[in-house]
């Protein structure tokens, strides 16, 4: 008995250690946003865990011990600075090094005011904007960490009627009217098996492990984000870890992945991801007649030359292949195999962003290049033994090179932002398609190419009163290119915008925005030629939409918010297919190529009312009508949609 007690006494501490809760430390640094100098003796707390925090040392660094695993944001406060909340971070064995930027506030020199800010708003976009944090990305039901599937539950967002695709229809618009940015670099499409001339696809290229947060705009677009009529998804990626090397291997529902974060020396950090799908194995085991396969990769490096200069390099690549499973038998399989082509797509984006902090000024120089190669191939009875069986061979490419400069200046209550950009777009299409009927199986040959130089400029100013009750923003943008004479004239694409927000009380805020936005029609429409090699759509103009939004927010103790927002949109200069009289806004939510037909302008109008609680509960109602200019008749294109 005595020996048993000794053994138990020895085992007990070991078991207690084994069942003790696992905790981690959170390390980071607090710096001044303008001077880039460390902020000493600032208080940093973990939001949601009372009393859990630390103070920065003389170098601005902090370390918070014994934090339970989970998703948290941090809050920093210091005398003379505005209290700031960070994006959400995952606390785990690979918790990243967190850098917090604080902004001076002369009104707070004699006191420290801690005001949590879970509902961040932009002065430029006080309505029609939502920030997607890690909590939503990781826990959104049914989304599988796919951003396009997360936002489909938001008010004003409808999903493709083809339910397995990520085509976003925002406030009655088209899938081609959405724009994507990643750390300030434009990404033409974020999905595998993309529809050329639109956006969307069944699976996202972006690995959620690398995302810090996403800003989703459904209106009130910032002046430095061009070419959007319906929405902008603005990704912010994490930075690499300057302290240690961390790697993660994952087996998902459709792919295996490897990601990592670390540092290369003392000045450079890196982040990467590589994924390989095994969908083709699953589809073959299920007896499906098509076998999709994709590979994607992503990387980001950041080099800090000194306190005032940094260079970010970013890359995103996707490779897609869809083969046919000709071994599959049965009536349904044979029907699909009779018309489905094999698909090969390669897409990539490479970009570099140099940022210089110069006191009140921040200058950014961004250079990027994106590329898409889309190929479809089909033989009669899937017999490729002879070229006589060829029914379709399509190869189409799109590429765009962009150089953009931005400068931001802070002058007390004012923030000014101005910039300019140059771009060069190249589009080619080489197709062979067998025509039947009156053409008696003739092999049609279609070739076209397009080379466009474009330019743009923008300016915006934000103002906030000393008591933070009133915020105003005004901006303009102008774009042009060499496609035709009207598009060369910048003032034809003059895009003004105005927004305002007023705090009626501590709980109520009234906000609104109005603006005119322009977007270039898809290259597939601009480059369409007839049999004589003449461009048929030379009379096209930039597509245009006028949008106004008005919203009201009600806050309860800064932890609960209910908002209601109404919007009105009026489209004009919208291309219309003369083949089926369907506007471009109603197309682009399927595989293949859209837009390569003859077009003419039309007008579309939509009105709506949306209610948007901060919790994942929402309702939307909108109605859209299409006005055919020749007859004046109104044809419904989208009905009323209700979503809970």
Residues covered by each model-derived region:
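Transmembrane beta-strands of outer-membrane beta-barrel pores
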Residues: 220, 237-239, 253-255, 276-280, ...
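Periplasmic N-terminal accessory/gating domains of Gram-negative outer-membrane beta-barrel systems
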Residues: 88-90, 115, 119-221, 232-234, ...
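Face-selective signature of the C-terminal outer-membrane beta-barrel domain
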Residues: 302-320, 341-487, 503, 563
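Surface-exposed extracellular loop regions of Gram-negative outer-membrane beta-barrel proteins
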Residues: 191, 327-332, 428-435, 506-548, ...
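C-terminal beta-signal and adjacent terminal beta-strands/loops
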Residues: 573, 579, 593-644
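Predominantly transmembrane beta-strands of Gram-negative outer membrane beta-barrel pores used
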Residues: 179, 213-224, 230-238, 245-289, ...
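Short, acidic Ser/Thr/Gly-rich low-complexity loop/linker segments typical of extracellular
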Residues: 49-61
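Short, acidic, small-residue-rich periplasmic hinge/interaction motif at the N-terminus
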Residues: 31, 35, 42-47, 77-82, ...
